[in-house]
A protein has these predicted regions:
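Intrinsically disordered, low-complexity cationic segments
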Residues: 33-34, 53-54, 62
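Polybasic, low-complexity binding patches
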Residues: 39-48, 56-90
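Cys/His-coordinated zinc-binding microdomains
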Residues: 22-23, 52-55
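A broad, low-specificity signal marking well-ordered, structured residues that form hydrophobic/aromatic
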Residues: 31, 48-49
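Short cysteine-rich loop/turn motifs with clustered Cys
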Residues: 3-32
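Helix-loop segments that flank and shape redox-cofactor active sites
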Residues: 31-39
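Divalent metal-coordination and catalytic microenvironments
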Residues: 13, 35, 51
Length: 90
């Protein structure tokens, strides 16, 4: 279950827009919340904002390509995107 603080954080990230689009020079793309899973509970996982294209697209997204191919294709890691978005929303 999400806390009020988690919901506020997720809302702030979604308002920022897709962090990968931002990195590519396209600011403000509507975003969904992507949980970075490294074991443990999903509710405890760090999250990044990704647009539907980069989140769920068949051959363009983290879920469509898998993490390793996604990171290779876009020359960045989930952790690097997390660090970037946290810097930008502060």
């Amino acid at each position: 279950m999400s806390t009020k603080a988690q919901k506020a954080h997720y809302d702030r990230l979604a308002r920022f827009g897709c962090i990968l689009c931002y990195k590519q020079g396209n600011e403000g793309t509507p975003a969904e919340i992507h949980h970075i899973r490294r074991g443990g509970k999903r509710s405890d996982a760090p999250v990044i904002p990704l647009c539907p294209y980069h989140h769920r697209g068949a051959n363009t997204s983290i879920h469509g390509m898998g993490r390793k191919r996604f990171e290779r294709e876009y020359a960045t890691t989930e952790e690097q995107l997390l660090k970037l978005v946290l810097q930008k929303i502060r």
